[in-house]
Amino acid sequence: MNIPKSVWWLVIGMALNITGASFLWPLNTIFMKEELHKSLTIAGIVLMINSFGMVVGNLLGGSLFDKLGGYKTILIGTFTCLCSTTLLNLFHGWPWYAIWLVLLGFGGGMIVPAIYAMAGAVWPNGGRQTFNAIYLAQNIGVALG
């Protein structure tokens, strides 16, 4: 069974999204330790809260997909990420850095369920193959990041 081209675009998008996110984990830890002079414990707690923001974003992203559709949900998540990244560049002192990082996790979290749901909607006959491809893209993204 061949995966449709539209699903491949979603797989590529997921791989890029997760690669970028996982690339930032060690970079954020170094920045918080060396530039913001916070302990590794604090850096770990901030990244944990960032992950909680992602979970909340996942929940909201799934709900928004049901109400607005995939395109608008991904657009809202991407806009949230763009705003938080811009604010990270402008206000990168403590505690603003941690706040914008949590907002970045929230926005990124909104994108993930929308991609899964869009893939299922685009290729309903794909069954497990659709979701396995996206799951594999997430794993590749983490490995590359």
Model-predicted regions and their roles:
Residues K67-T78:
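Cytoplasmic membrane-interface "Motif A"-like loop-to-helix N-cap segments
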Residues K5-S51:
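Helix-loop boundary and gating motifs at the non-cytosolic
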Residues G57-G69:
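Helix-to-loop junctions at the C-terminal end of transmembrane segments
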Residues N132-G145:
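Glycine-rich segments within core transmembrane alpha-helices of 12-TM secondary carriers
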Residues F79-H92:
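C-terminal ends and interior cores of transmembrane alpha-helices
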